[in-house]
Each structure stands twice: as C-alpha cells, then as structure tokens.
Amino acid sequence: YMKKYIKNIVPATFMMLALGATSCIGDLDVDPIDPNIDTNVDLNGLFNKCYANMALAGNGGANGDCDIDGLDGGTTGFIRQLFNSNELTTDEAICGWGDEGVASFCYNTYNASHPMLNGFYARLTTGITYCNQYLAMAGDTDATMSAEIRFVRALHYFLLMDGWGNIPFTLEPMTKPEQRSRAQMYEWLEQELIGIEPALSEAKAKKSTDAGYGRVDKAACWLLLSRLYLNSEIYTGTAQWQKAKEYADKVIKSSYRLNTVGKGGWTAYQMLFMGDNGETDAAYEALLPLLQDGLTTTSWGTSLFLIAGCFDGEMHANPNDLTATNGVSAQNWGGNRARPDLIRKFFPQNDAPELPSYDMYVAAKDDRALFDGVGRTLNNEDVSTFKSGYAIAKFTNFKTDGSAGHDATFADTDYFLLRVAEAYLTFAEADARLNGGNTTSEGTQAVNSIRSRAHASTRTNAYSLDDICDEWSREFYFEGRRRMDLIRFNRYGGNNNYTWQWKGGSYEGRSFDAHLNIFAIPTNELTANSNLTQNPGY
C-alpha cells in the first residue's frame, strides 16, 4: 500500500492538525495527540506519514498544506534541501537562482539564519516528531512496522547529526529535547540500528508490483550502519573501517543488486533515474525508494526538483525522441548545473565536447557522464547564467518502453535514497584504508563492479584513496552526499589543498574555515530550547 502514500495520508490529515506539526521552529517539542481524545487516529496513515515526510511537503499533493512554515512547500522538500546542503556546497553543483540562501550555499558562507538550512533542519526534526508519535501510539502493535519507523527516525537523526553535529535528541513526543554531541549520537545510532535489525523484514529486492516496495528491510539497516562506520572517524575520532566493510559486504551479498542491463536504448545507469525506475530491474538496486507518482504522489521538492531544476528548454535527453526535453511538460527551471571540477572527473584533459547527454557519455567512455554541453561553457564564469557550466541530464521522467508519464507536470520517477552501489564503494574505501591507502584485490573488484556497470575501464592493479574519492563523485553526483564524502577525505573546510571553482566564494577557489564542516543550529531553535548551545565558530 506504499506506492500511493497519499491514499493513506489524507485520512490522517485531521490528526496532523491535532499534532500541531506545522512546526514553525521545527523543534522536536511538538504537541502530541492525546490518545484518550483521538481514538480514531489512522495508524496506517501515521505510519505512511513517517515515510512520506521524505517525499512530500505535507498532506495532500504538491500544492497542499506544507508541514513546515516560513518557506514555500517545494523549497522545504527533503530531497531538495538534502541536495542544496550537500551538493551546492561542493565541487559538484552550482546554482544561479536568486532565492535567499542559494548563493551562500554555493560560496560556503552559510550561518545560523540560513533559511534553507533551517528549513531542512525543520523537515528532519518534524519527521522525527512523526516517528516518535507513531511509536508512542502504536509501538507495540506490529514489531516489523515499529522497527521500520525506528529506522526512519534513525535515518533522520543520522542526517541531522551529519549536518549539525550537536543536536537536540528525544524519543518522546512530549519532552523537551536535550542536546547530544556527535559522539553520543553515533553511539545511540549504532545501538539503535543493531537493536532493530532482527525485527526488520528479511532483505529482499523488490519492484513496485511487489509487497513492501518503498519500505525498508534489513539491507537498509546494514547500509546505514556501514555509512555510520565509514564516517566514524569524523563523528567520534575513532575509525571503524573493518565494520564498515563487513556491513557493506552484507548488502553486496543480499538479493539487492546493481542494475547492469540497459533497456529501450537507455543504459542500466540511466534506468536508476527514470520515470519507470520502480517498474524495471533498476528497482532491485533501491534499498529505500521514495515513491513519486505524477497523479497521486506529487512534490515540487523531490524527483521533479532534480529533473526540472537541471534542465532548460533547449536540452534534449531522449535518444529516441530528439524533440523531448526531460519527460515532464514545460518544467525546465534551469538552475542547478555542474561545476567544471565534476566534468573533469570524466574528462581530465579539459576536453569535454559540446554534445547532448546521449552522445556525451559515449565520448566519456562512461555511462554516468550524463552531461549536456551544447552551447555551454565548461567554467561557471557567470554563476547567474544557466549556460555558464555544463548541464546535468541524469534525472528524467522518460520511460524505457517509450510510454508517457502519468501526468504532464509531475514526475513518476522514484528517488532512490539508498542504493546498492553505495555498499560497493564503502567496501572499497574501507578496504583501502585498512591496506595503507590502496585496495586489495577484493576492494579493486568492488570498484570494478561499479565501473563495469557504467561500461568504464577497469583495472587489475589497486585503486588509491584519491581514485575512490573521485569514484564517489562519478557514481553519486547530485545525489546529496558529496559534502559528507569531501569531509571524510579532508577536502572540505579547513586548510587543505583541494579546491574547486568558487570554493569559499573565490572563482579560483580558496579554503574556508573548518567550523563550516558543521552547520549552525538555527537561531530560532536556540531561542526556543534553552538546552541547546550554538556550534563553535558561529
């Protein structure tokens, strides 16, 4: 029943009003439902709401009530702000829009009053509130469902901890959150994920036609644990490479698998980001797909944001229809595009051609080079101009069988928030870090698996950590994780010799202070909760 979140959310609307969850300050201290009063709460609706917080702005569709005040609904989208905070701040993405907060992301000058960071913080804390509410009301009803909601809550807490470091923490809907350090949150997350694993469903790859598609199972738990362990040295000061490798290996050996066979003139990699990705074998790569449907599950801030926000009307990304742009009608917002540093990961000689995406990846000899260079410059000399920089044609609403989307405006493309490829690169990186900075034969094989899926060259000798840092970018650009990876490789804030165009607000790129590796606690949060203190440097 998950493919259409809305069917089950709408009956819960009255309940969300009781929750008072519009959370203008986004804190975790939201008024709970009193079960003695609200005896008709739709628990399935609340269960779905916990998942849907990552895919929808609020109750109803794209233009319905938003759960976060102070920004328009599309801007508060979970994926939109995951992208903005973790991609616009890095060597991958830049945006020329004038919305308040975009430039300070791009130039690494964000602070405690940043509207989009504060919106993402509110989105995460509101999602935690929904999970706490469900567990308080239905925690003993169904062990598997409760374990899933505990996972969703842990994922929200992970993102909050990764972004803001020292964060408000509570498991009760009615208590004022205490502040916990990153190291404390790490310890809680590790124990929580290990604790819920037995109650989660067995790891089983699924398509949208299978029961449970859109819900997490043991494999998602293993992948989040492997991510936690991979970043342990940043979070706690102590590395956990062996555990990262072990949990990544569990995912690799599960029934989830890399999509390796293309269809209908599309590559296997492209299929992961298309309008029928839940219906094709691409779905078997997704450990947590966020469901989208152009008719029933609509959002301005999820897949459509990554499709429309990266296209202008002159781009054509369909090799089978040279008049089509991106598979949605008249949704070409032309904002987010590549920094030259991303393109150079595929064209190290600065010789990226001016071609459409379906010819670009052939020239790159790598299916992941889904860039449009027609009439564009490689450099971002004029940040406000969309053609100043190569465009990204990675996300579309096209379908492998050539059929039309369910709706002209909104996308059917599910967003694969967790996918198997992460396990391969986690395994390889942990392997290299355990082996003096170069992969052993099994780590080499893990990188080769990722590269051969993309028809890129492979090797028999080792991959270095530098190679792996670049491979994270090639495989996952624009998927909302680059900031985390750069920090782990000491290439983000602080004095390091890794620069990119416009890093720190300088065209040539310059270092910025290490305190920016952690975002600022929103000012209004500090006012609302006396338990919180601001992060250092802000």
Locate predicted features.
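Membrane-proximal, proline-rich intrinsically disordered regions
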Residues: C24-F78, S530-Y538
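Flexible, polar/acidic helix-loop-strand segments at domain edges
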Residues: W97-G119, R337-R419
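Short coil/turn linking the two alpha-helices of tandem helical-hairpin repeats
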Residues: M161-P168, N231-G237, N435-G437
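Long, intrinsically disordered, low-complexity segments
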Residues: S23-D27, N40-L43, I94-C95, L124-T125, ...
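Extended ligand-binding clefts on enzyme/binding-domain cores
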Residues: L258-K387
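Conserved, well-structured interaction surfaces
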Residues: N44, N48, A52, A57-G58, ...
